Every structure is written in structure tokens, then in C-alpha cells.
From Swiss-Prot:
Chief subcellular location: cytoplasm
Self-association state and partner proteins as the record states: Monomer. Binds 30S ribosomal subunits, but not 50S ribosomal subunits or 70S ribosomes.
Family: Belongs to the RbfA family.
GO molecular function, one term: ribosomal small subunit binding
Keyword Transcription: no
Protein's recorded name: Ribosome-binding factor A
Subcellular localization, as worded in the UniProt entry: Cytoplasm
PROSITE patterns, alphabetized: RBFA (PS01319)
Amino acid sequence: MADNARAARMAKRIQTIVASAIERDIKDRRLEFVTITDVTMTGDLHDAKVFYTVRGASIEEEPDLEAAAEALHRARGQLRKIVGQQLGVRFTPTLTYSIDTVPEASAHMEALLDRARKRDEELAKLREGAAPAGDADPYKTSSKSESEE
């Protein structure tokens, strides 16, 4: 069983190798807009999960997730061979690919936080002109009559 530091180093190295291989060695146009975001390794260093994101050709264009997944699936053997050659370990880990949902989740969280900020601003504006419903201080305080008794 390998230590976690070695698994982390190997994962980072695999991320670099796969990203550069997609950019330089794999000639598939469906992988043009694929970015490798993270790699996680199992403790025995036999399996690596490669996380990726896909963007569209322009800001308005939606990414083609299915085509990118198919292209990565077709290139998995070639990518594993490249990883094995450059990694220099006895056993080349099996690579599995998974879409990274962190960017979408963070965009959703930003939208929720923006909505909460706008609501806070609305409440602050309403609070500016508000006055207490009763007296200024509705709580009973010690008065002179109690202290005189």
C-alpha cells in the first residue's frame, strides 16, 4: 500500500501527462476544448480517475459533453500507453474519465449568493425608513419608583 503523498504526486504527474497528450498527441477535434482539472488515485496506485471539463467554441455555444466523453473513451488506450511510458512505474494505472461538475456547482452557488445579496439590499432599503411599532424601548427598566421603595 502506497502512502498518500506518493499517490498525490502520481496523480499530479498523470494530470500533466494526460493534459499534454490531449493537446499534442491525440488528434481528435472533439478534444479541442477539453481541460483536465484533477486526477485522483486509489491507495494501491492501480486506478486513476481523471476529471475534465468541456467548454464550447464560444461563450454562447454549449459544450458537447457527449462527443468529448466518446473521444476520451476512444483514446483511453493510447492515453494509458503514453502515461505508462512517461510515468516510469511497474504498473500503469487504469484511467477512467469523469466530467467535473465543480464549475457548474460553483456557478450555481454564485447565483444563489447573488440572489441573497440582492434580497439583503432590498431589506436594508426597507429598514431605512422603518420606525419601531411601539415605544422606542419596549422593555421594562428600573425606574425611580422602584428604587424609592
